Amino acid sequence: MTATSSVKFIILTALLMSVSCKAGAQTIDSARLTAAAIREEQALKARIGVAVLDTASGLIQSYRGHERFPLNSTHKPLLCGVLLSNIDQGKFTLTEKIQFEKEKLVDYSPVTGKFVTPLSMDWQQLCSAAVAYSDNTAANLVAQKVGGPAAVNRFLAAIGDTTTRSDRFEPDLNSSLPGDERDTTTPEAISQTLYKLVLGDVLHSDSRQQLTQWMLDDKVADALLRSVLPPGWRIADKSGAGDYGSRSIISVVWPEKSSPLVIAVYITQTTATMTQSNEAIARIGQAIFSATKGKVN
């Protein structure tokens, strides 16, 4: 697929029911978005994908928006979305406690490592650990609870996402091999799915608020979009990282005086350091935020 910028209408029933498209609604500067992505792509010698869903107009704009990128830890809000959907159906509760042995721990488990048997954690704590702290063992426990990758894929397909795919558990899903479609998404697909989970009607109101809160509480993404967020704006996000220089973030951003944006940025196939990729994502975010501020009436 060629690296082109695309602008298209998204047919999302909940979106069209909840917002009106009218003259003067906020828009994103497509040329600036494309230029920012290409500039960072060339600087990092990377492949970069960006999508911005403007909920005021129902438009999504993207650069490499239909190309596949490694999910890495951006899959964790999806896992907890599936868990919350199960809770909405009465299958179990957030306060249900589980115990797990030390042998269950995998690399990067800053929270769960403190709660092995005889201690316990409930699902609220585990999703907080997975989303806000990117705890890998917590993510695996949630994935196992909902039925593994196959169940995640069934859920995604049921809400209209037949692109994003879950195949493995942490940490194996972070291999990020070029051309490997396992555990991948596209910037446009995951932006639409995140919209449905956080702003749509896929989850009950309480569950939407809970998922949003876990992402608002993100403790590991300060160097990315949060570092350039304008005063008075809010962000709920989840970052990811993997092999082949993969770095990513998905987010819902609430500007101070306009409707939310759903933003996804994915970087892969680069030898850049994580710091360099973080700075690149921040600069892309700055371009998006500046363009948005310039268009708001």
Question: What is each model feature region?
Answer:
Residues 47, 119, 140-199:
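Mid-domain, small-residue-enriched loop/turn segments at the edges of structured enzyme/sensor domains
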Residues 8-20:
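Bacterial N-terminal signal peptides
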Residues 58, 70-100, 263:
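Active-site SXXK
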